[in-house]
Amino acid sequence: MSITAPGIYEMDDATYHADPVEAGSLSSSGARTILKSPALYQWERQHPVYKDVYDVGHAVHAKVLGVGLDTVEIPADTLAANGATSTKAAKDFIAQARAEGKVPLKADVIAEINTMAESVLSHPLARALLERPGQSEASLFAPDPETGVWLRARIDRLPDAHPAGRTIAVDLKTGRSADPAEFKRSAADYGYDLQAEWYQAVLRQVRDDDDTAFVFIVVESTAPHLVSVIELGGTFPQIGRDRMRRAIDTFHHCRETGEWPGYDPVVHYVEPPRYYEIQNEEPAA
């Protein structure tokens, strides 16, 4: 598959991440990496590595959304006496499953994933957002109006366009905490503000729809698997748009010049963070 026109497409996860745009495209995760360092972005693009830390997230997505990578149970008789996947039989099974595009997990992890999915679908607002007519794992592609750089986005749940309603795109996340007060720190740490603005910008282009919103459905990875629905507000949207613009411009410049720099080649003078100073203050007499 080769993408040459803006639009919303159906494709599997592997095709999307392989980048089907002939001229190359930039995703929101790539944008967040390029803001750290263009050199890091270029290295990761040329040396992709699958991280099994994402296995649970992929499995929960597939269970809730009904699309995605298939989950397969690692046979109990291949495990070590302590339940570890350190035996040759277990390693061979895992390698074969990954080669087939599946997510290999132990039975207890699969049971936990099923419970997480049930928690999401038992949440009235989360369920309502996910059950609207639409497309799961929708792949969107459109060029940036300012630079011509192709942008791509993969939205977990994209509702069908409705002339009388607002388009609320959904991203499903698993994490340590779904507490909204803690999620705002995660949003800042992991660049979810950029992700939200990125997805909406691409969506507005392919649908010509200015009335969009983006929410996160967050489910905790430990029991009782609490769920919350969160929309980023305050200055998050503007910060996200600013970071998005900077990432696209940086990508465009690097591609035009063929230079993907790392950190500036100077001596970097750093001062201790405030928390470290407080930890080491002399106690009051």
Question: Where are the language model's segments positioned?
Answer:
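Short acidic (Asp/Glu) and glycine-rich catalytic loops that position anionic groups and cofactors
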Residues: P38-Y41, T174-D179, T222-S228
